[in-house]
């Protein structure tokens, strides 16, 4: 089940992003001289993951369950191993970063807990970073206005139960009135409540 969870064929490869990163370091503007120098010395990256909770909910896995813990460990160990392999290969090709000379690494830092909630919204409303969704329904305020956000995985569960449009509207209002919680809903099983 967890073995085939993520397509990892593209992880760890050398890409145009590394070339672009090097180009920006070399062309650092005068106002950024110290930052450019620091970046050149350590060549830190911030590889992270997003959509962790969305992934779990899409597969019907509770965030605090044993499957989530196992997948979390396995997925992030895989990311770390691929990032470490890639930085070592880059050190062979392009040389080590000056701050880590003798360690066979091109980059001092590889991983970061990122991105944030704004990135999650931009990426089709996925969950931010490795964090859980803050609620199943809430009002999102932006410069262009406010709109209600509904958990798309929970909405799918409701639709599979064959609810009518009016029933769905009432349920979403009820969820919004309970700060996005579904723990009070009798239509959901205990297992579904654990997921959402």
What do these predicted regions represent?
Residues 1-196:
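Long, C-terminal-biased catalytic regions of enzyme "large/alpha" subunits
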